[in-house]
Design a protein with these regions (language model features):
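Surface-exposed binding patches on compact interaction domains or structured appendages
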Residues: 1-7, 93-122, 208-237
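Short, hydrophobic beta-strand segments
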Residues: 11-19, 125-132, 240-248
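C-terminal soluble interaction/assembly domains
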Residues: 197-206, 211-280
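Short, solvent-exposed loop/turn segments enriched in Ser/Thr/Gly
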Residues: 18-27, 79-86, 132-143, 193-201, ...
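Short acidic/proline- and small/hydrophobic-mixed sequence motifs that coincide with surface turns
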Residues: 23, 38, 94-99, 137, ...
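Long, low-complexity ectodomains and other extracytoplasmic segments of secretory-pathway proteins
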Residues: 34-83, 93, 148-202, 206-207, ...
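Beta-strand-rich extracellular modules
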Residues: 14-16, 31-35, 130, 146-148, ...
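Solvent-exposed, conformationally flexible loop/turn segments
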Residues: 6-8, 77-82, 120-122, 191-196, ...
């Protein structure tokens, strides 16, 4: 389907549910002539046994509008690019309204900026996050809805994950790129519940140029970073040491903590480190 520069094209997708009343998340890959990397479109939704009132279908309320989740995932993006997602908002009240947005994070854009929503109806907004080289990994972006000219008492939170972009790297740059090497799973000595456990990973750069660690990120608030590095020279190693608080961990349960390093290694832009805690 050809379309000229500056023009827009529309892709219509119909999901035929055969899995029953469950949430669904499907991916459609769109390929463009002259581009190796496809555009991945995510189609998400929920299937219910029967129709529910909007107030229940969209249970997170900001005044008279409702969303399905309190934190909206925009998606993944590489530096120099943007990520977008379409979000459905519901006017669950019995009165029409106008919806606009204010106090948005600098990298966040919501379109349309102003729209009218009839009573008991839904509308769609396109949320776009623009990358920023000062922001890596998972970041929060916020915007406050304004309903009929009145600012909501709380903001809507969006998340996006940003990693390095290697699409503009030359063959020579890729040949001389840093290469990380590490053991990605650690099982520290078993501890009693409530005791602290420590884990240390050693990351080696076996490439030809410095390995940059843009960000060290945890999936748990039970982790404390004791030692890290922001750059590892070729041939060098660096230690990443963590302390784990185990007061909420359970015996015979999955007590795995995940650490993610965001790097400039084309083969491992994200390094996942797993700490598996055993409670006695």
């Amino acid at each position: 389907m050809p379309f000229a520069p500056g023009e827009k094209a529309q892709i219509d997708i119909t999901y035929t549910n055969e899995d029953g009343p469950y949430p669904f998340d499907k991916t459609v890959s769109v390929y463009f002539e002259g581009h190796k990397k496809p555009l991945n479109l995510h189609i998400r939704g929920d299937v219910h046994k029967e129709a529910l009132p909007l107030e229940q279908t969209y249970p997170i309320h900001y005044g008279r509008i409702g969303l399905k989740k309190d934190v909206v995932k925009v998606g993944n993006l590489s530096q120099g690019e943007v990520a977008s997602t379409e979000v459905t908002v519901a006017n669950w009240s019995d009165k029409p309204m106008t919806l606009s947005w204010i106090d948005s994070t600098a990298e966040l854009h919501i379109e349309p900026a102003h729209q009218a929503i009839e009573a008991g109806k839904t509308a769609r907004v396109v949320v776009t996050v623009r990358s920023n080289r000062s922001k890596w990994g998972k970041n929060l972006y916020v915007s406050t809805p304004v309903i009929d000219g009145k600012k909501s008492g709380k903001c809507v939170t969006f998340t996006a994950i940003t990693k390095e972009n290697f699409s503009s790297w030359s063959v020579e740059m890729l040949k001389d790129a840093p290469v990380s090497k590490t053991r990605d799973v650690l099982l520290p000595s078993p501890v009693q519940k409530g005791e602290r456990s420590e884990a240390e990973f050693e990351v080696e750069n076996i490439g030809k140029t410095p390995l940059t660690i843009y960000k060290t990120e945890f999936d748990s608030d039970k982790l404390d970073l004791l030692k890290s590095a922001s750059e590892i020279r070729p041939g060098d190693k660096a230690a990443f040491r963590f302390s784990v608080r185990t007061d909420s961990f359970q015996k015979d349960s999955d007590n795995t903590c995940v650490v993610t390093l965001y790097t400039n290694d084309p083969s491992h832009p994200l390094i996942h480190l797993y700490i598996e805690i055993i409670i006695l």
